[in-house]
């Protein structure tokens, strides 16, 4: 099942970008794997990505296609949990990385950013539920 991911508020992205480092994705790459320890989130500045959730059997249960303005790995970063999906970006995508530590310090220093983070997480939950209801 495929779905399109919600996009983050441009103000939130702007603040996160100020703390981020560029990630080379010239040939496309896997950013993180389902079950891997979370070390931060990724900002998809341009290009395309897919986030895939697999069952223990290896069967793909859910797939989200993302575009510019998406934050990949946000639920794991906020929850301090392993990544719940695998994220891959296509060749030529522009991606930036924010460490979990830097994200936590930012939200502590600027708590007014939290409503935007929560809205994005809620949109991801709604999107996943809608996709699951279509099966």
Question: What is each model feature region?
Answer:
Residues 1-135:
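Cytosolic regulatory regions built on CNB/CRP/Popeye-like sensor folds
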């Amino acid at each position: 099942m495929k779905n399109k991911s919600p996009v983050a508020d441009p103000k939130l992205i702007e603040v996160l970008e100020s703390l981020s480092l560029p990630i080379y994705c010239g040939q496309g790459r896997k950013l993180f794997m389902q079950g891997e320890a979370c070390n931060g989130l990724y900002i998809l500045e341009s290009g395309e990505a897919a986030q895939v959730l697999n069952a223990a059997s290896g069967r793909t249960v859910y797939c989200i296609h993302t575009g510019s303005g998406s934050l990949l790995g946000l639920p794991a970063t906020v929850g301090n949990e392993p990544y719940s999906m695998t994220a891959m970006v296509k060749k030529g995508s522009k991606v930036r990385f924010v460490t979990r530590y830097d994200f936590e310090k930012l939200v502590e220093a600027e708590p007014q950013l939290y409503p935007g983070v929560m809205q994005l997480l809620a949109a991801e939950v709604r999107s996943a539920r809608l996709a699951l209801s279509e099966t």
